[in-house]
Amino acid sequence: MSAHRQLRLGTILHGASGNMSAWRHPAAIADASINFDFVKETALKAEEGKLDFLFVADGLYINEKSIPHFLNRFEPLTVLSALASITSRLGLVGTLSTSYSEPFTTARQFASLDHLSNGRAGWNVVTSPLEGSAKNFSREKHPEHALRYRIADEYLDVVKGLWDSWEEDAFIRNKESGQFFDPAKLHPLNHHGDFFQVAGPLNIGRTPQGRPVVFQAGASDDGKKLAAKHADAIFTHHDTFEEAKAFYRDVKQQLETNGRRASDLHIFQGISVIVGNDAEDVENQYQTTAALVSINDALNYLGRYFEHHDFSQYPLDEPFPDIGDLGKNSFRSTTDEIKRNARERNLTLRQVALEAASPRPRFSGTPEEVADGLQAWFEGYAADGFIIQGGTPDTFPRFVDQVVPVLQARGLFRTDYPGTTLRDSLGLEQPKNTFTQQ
């Protein structure tokens, strides 16, 4: 392992963790998605383990078939602002959609979070996959996939430009002279594009990190292109080492075409983990959680990926139905993978639904075995880091207490935070102000 390359770790607040029915688990906090004591405990545990960040996902549409913890959960920026006051080094990353918000407001919100946290804010950029989102924002139609990414591209140009409105030392605040700021260090944006007309400047100063860290979630071609141009990190998910390695290579090559270095963007694989004493213990933990998922729950979960399609209309024990292009305008990369996997393995609808709703954790075993898996993917250049989700409701504390020390002993993961900001933790350079380079 290169002395200059360190494994990165984050965790996700995802209800009770485990699968969609894990809130029923004996060890679960049933209202975890709206329980701030649980949220606080998770954040403090992550910081105890020296993790890079805690990530709060989000969505803008629900119905009666939605995943239970999606029905009642905190808005990301609100809960992250609360966590800023009780943590000191942990990065705070939240999702916000470019399809259903305005760049000025987004730039202001994440700049505020970066100031509140002394430089620990991160924005996970999504374009919103669920078509029902349009109904909650006075829209007649959800934008098509390609259009959403064109909007996101310009949106990010605007937000980053607004974050550069003020130079770092623009606010003089000289009481004797009465000069509050230096006008020469204020830069209106005056953006006129295809989708946005934004004058600027932003009404909050340059942030402790220069700019909050930009994450992008998605594995489609459009998503990879957007990340290679704009992002500091990308969230993705692949089932095999070979798929993850191919994705890693592709994104890193696209960075070069954008004049960026491979080290300018970290690739995080989202993984589920079970830590146990031995193989029998791990299997018992998995089966206990998997048994909580009914076939109806599984069909509803699967349908969410396919624009809330009703899969209950098909025979359960016949081959996965031909549903054409359904899913191409929602979770495109995920639905393509589900259909391909079902076809190649000749899976029934029942098998596809249960595998989707209660997948086996990618990395499971003793602490040493889990660490072995993470190390193999990291050193094999299939990932720069991982977003840890517990395969059971009580897995994450075990991961911090038992797996992190193994990674630290192997020199893969740090034993303390290297600085105070999220960029410090991730080893990312502070971006220069684009206006001062002109």
Regions found by a protein language model. Name each.
Residues 2-4, 47-48, 80-88, 114-120, ...:
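Acidic (Asp/Glu)-rich catalytic clusters
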Residues 2-17, 146-209, 242-249, 253-376, ...:
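An alpha-helical appendage that flanks or caps ligand/catalytic pockets
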Residues 7-11, 54-56, 90-96, 119-125, ...:
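Hydrophobic faces of well-ordered beta-strands that scaffold small-molecule active sites
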Residues 22-37, 95-104, 140-142, 208-221, ...:
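Active-site mouth loops of central-metabolism enzymes
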Residues 67-93, 257-258, 397-415:
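Alpha-helix-loop-beta-strand connector modules within alpha/beta enzyme cores
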Residues 86-87, 91-137, 143-146, 151-155:
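Hydrophobic or amphipathic alpha-helical targeting/insertion segments
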